[in-house]
From Swiss-Prot:
This is Nuclear cap-binding protein subunit 3. The keyword Mitochondrion does not apply. InterPro entries: NCBP3, Nucleotide-bd_a/b_plait_sf. Associates with NCBP1/CBP80 to form an alternative cap-binding complex (CBC) which plays a key role in mRNA export. NCBP3 serves as adapter protein linking the capped RNAs (m7GpppG-capped RNA) to NCBP1/CBP80. Unlike the conventional CBC with NCBP2 which binds both small nuclear RNA (snRNA) and messenger (mRNA) and is involved in their export from the nucleus, the alternative CBC with NCBP3 does not bind snRNA and associates only with mRNA thereby playing a role in only mRNA export. PANTHER family: NUCLEAR CAP-BINDING PROTEIN SUBUNIT 3. Residues 126-187 are annotated as: RNA recognition motif (RRM) domain. Residues 185-198, 366-388, 459-474, 511-521, 554-569, 585-598 have a biased composition (Basic and acidic residues). The modification Phosphothreonine is found at residue 413. GO terms for cellular component: cytoplasm; nuclear cap binding complex; nuclear speck; nucleus; RNA cap binding complex. The gene is NCBP3.
Length: 620
């Protein structure tokens, strides 16, 4: 068995540089010399502690939002704060006999950026931290720095923000020329300049010279004093900049005094700063359509859902046909506030709680896991649609921003046409059995359908006694109302069989009824044999089929001759028809028995057929 070596990583906020960088410390060296086991000799299950130096603030995501300035994309590329630029400017002033510049807005201060980065490890030389902007908006800050237009602004809270430039030189010029030394540093610089000027005056008084020379020396003294003042001012100011002290601004902004310094990486927006903002409550929150006052979480969720729906409807052209191929650029991140539809807060606290509970239930219902069966039987495939809308909850995340790209892509994706549904195997078997039963019933009905074999069904006919019809025709009297037959037996419709066990004559003989639409009855021809009007029922013509197949004669004489001539052949036809009817009746009874057997089957019994076997193979 190979030895198992464990590793334990401990994150420490402050750790010595030696162990963090992997350098051997004296304690470790002494431990190794004392005979501690080497890595190859570590026993099984032993843990080794490896310290890792990592700041916890670096793990926190950056929630700052940038407000871009359209006029801040210009860069000069000239460093006027360098020593070479200042020396050239002084030489040019001496050449043309200019006095030293006393204007604080155009001071010559040499700044060593490498020294600044060493003194302040996390400094951002292209960014200036400003505090005291309680009543100022984003446009007010941009207009305040219009002489040095910045690139964008990062708001930290109601009282402070970071103003960012595209280069370090412009930010340094703005900080030095738009701010001054603190009051204590000014006093120190004045004291130093006064001491040096007093010493030089004493030296000048001790020297004896002519009046012309004194005048010239006086001019030189003035120049030297001014040079000394500039040197001391730059030295004190450089020390103040190295300490990164807050510098008061030269001009007021809306009656407030601003203070500025170089920003550092620790100057970040705190979590939940937007909810605690008094400026948003007083002047309106631009992230929510400029609404003033306290905004509840339910109101924010409704606002975000409406905003996303409006973006999908109005800006559908920005999203390609294939979602994900074209990137969606959100246009609400700029400074210009898009006019939004105000949403009034009509609900009270109780109604808001109810809505939050309903939304949580809806979200839980939307998050259900479902399984899709891709191959199903054709009878089971039904068009079902399901639309899922995901809502972003502001209470779960402290940041006020949303990933609009992700939300829009998820909403714009079409819902699947096939519904995803989880079913049990027993349900599938039962559905297959139902389909098989329905198909068997359809086959049995179609096979035993008499209408399809014989022909189209005649319109509903009313049967009456032939004798009454013949008597009425003869007497030219008004016909009686037809007698309704309650019996619907097939034997009455087809007539009696030729070898019927019943007696030929009875006290109340059953007479076969014929339709009133018979051709012979319409022509008024009596249908009787030579034996008499009331002959045996065996010799009578059968049913509706004979009346449909037989052709009526043009004259009465021809009709009587043809009836007498075709009497023996008609009996043979009747026997054939009766046999066919008997076969059909047997088939119908057999189909009923099959259906009764299928209905009595248990619900989980499986019948193997071609359709079921092919469906199972497709599913496998």
């Amino acid at each position: 068995m190979a030895a198992v070596r464990g590793l334990r990583v401990s994150v420490k906020a402050e750790a010595p540089a030696g162990p963090a960088l992997g350098l051997p410390s004296p304690e470790a060296e002494s431990g190794v010399d004392r005979g501690e086991p080497e890595p190859m000799e570590v026993e099984e299950g032993e843990l080794e502690i490896v310290p890792v130096r990592r700041s916890l603030k670096e793990l926190i995501p950056d929630t700052s939002r940038r407000y871009e300035n359209k006029a801040g994309s210009f860069i000069t590329g000239i460093d006027v704060t360098s020593k070479e630029a200042i020396e050239k400017k002084e030489q040019r002033a001496k050449r043309f006999h200019f006095r030293s510049e006393v204007n604080l807005a155009q001071r010559n201060v040499a700044l060593d950026r490498d020294m600044m980065k060493k003194a302040i490890p996390k400094v951002r030389l292209e960014t200036i931290y400003i505090c005291g902007v309680d009543e100022m908006s984003t446009q007010d800050v941009f207009s305040y720095f219009k002489e040095y237009p910045p690139a964008h602004i990062e708001w930290l809270d109601d009282t402070s923000c970071n103003v960012v430039w595209l280069d370090e030189m412009t930010a340094t010029r703005a900080l030095i020329n738009m701010s001054s030394l603190p009051a204590q540093d000014k006093i120190r610089s004045r004291d130093a300049s006064e001491d040096k000027s007093a010493e030089k005056r004493k030296k000048d008084k001790q020297e004896d010279s002519s009046d012309d020379d004194e005048a010239e020396e006086g001019e030189v003294e003035d120049e030297n004093s001014s040079d000394v003042e500039l040197d001391t001012l730059s030295q004190v100011e450089e020390e103040s900049l190295l300490r990164n002290d807050l510098r008061p601004a030269n001009k007021l902004a809306k009656g407030n005094r601003l203070f500025m310094r170089f920003a550092t990486k620790d100057d970040k927006k705190e979590l939940g700063a937007a909810r605690r903002s008094q400026y948003y409550m007083k002047y309106g929150n631009p992230n929510y359509g400029g609404m003033k006052g306290i905004l509840s979480n339910s109101w924010k969720r409704r606002y975000h859902s409406r905003r996303i729906q409006r973006d999908v409807i109005k800006k559908r052209a920005l999203i390609g046909d294939d979602v994900g191929l074209t990137s969606y650029k959100h246009r609400h991140s700029g400074l210009v506030n898009v006019p939004e539809e105000p949403i009034e807060e009509e609900e009270e606290e109780e109604e808001e709680e109810e809505e939050e509970e309903e939304e949580d239930q809806d979200m839980d219902a939307d998050d259900r896991v479902v399984v899709e069966y891709h191959e199903e039987l054709p009878a089971l495939k039904q068009p079902r649609e399901r639309s899922a809308s995901r809502r972003s909850s502001a209470s779960s995340s402290d940041s006020d921003e949303m990933d609009y790209d992700l939300e829009l892509k998820m909403i714009s994706t079409p819902s699947p046409k096939k519904s995803m549904k989880m079913t049990m195997y027993a349900d599938e078997v039962e559905s297959q059995l139902k389909n098989i039963r329905n198909s068997m019933r359809a086959d049995s009905v179609s096979s035993s359908n008499i209408k399809n074999r014989i022909g189209n069904k005649l319109p509903p006919e009313k049967f009456a006694d032939v004798r009454h019809l013949l008597d009425e025709k003869r007497q030219h009297s008004r016909p009686r109302p037809p007698v309704s037959s309650t019996k619907s037996d097939i034997r009455q419709r087809l007539g009696k069989r030729p070898h019927s066990p019943e007696k030929a004559f009875s006290s109340n003989p059953v007479v076969r009824r014929e339709p009133s639409s018979d051709v012979h009855s319409r022509l008024g021809v009596p249908r009787q044999d030579s034996k008499g009007l009331y002959a045996d029922t065996r010799e009578k013509k059968s049913g509706n089929l004979w009346t449909r197949l037989g052709s009526a004669p043009k004259t009465k004489e021809k009709n009587t001759k043809k009836v007498d001539h075709r009497a023996p052949g008609a009996e043979e036809d009747d026997s054939e028809l009766q046999r066919a009817w008997g076969a059909l009746i047997k088939e119908k009874e057999q189909s009923r028995q099959k259906k009764s057997r299928l209905d009595n089957l248990p619900s989980l019994q499986i019948e193997v057929s071609r359709e079921s076997s092919s469906g199972s193979e497709a599913e496998s």
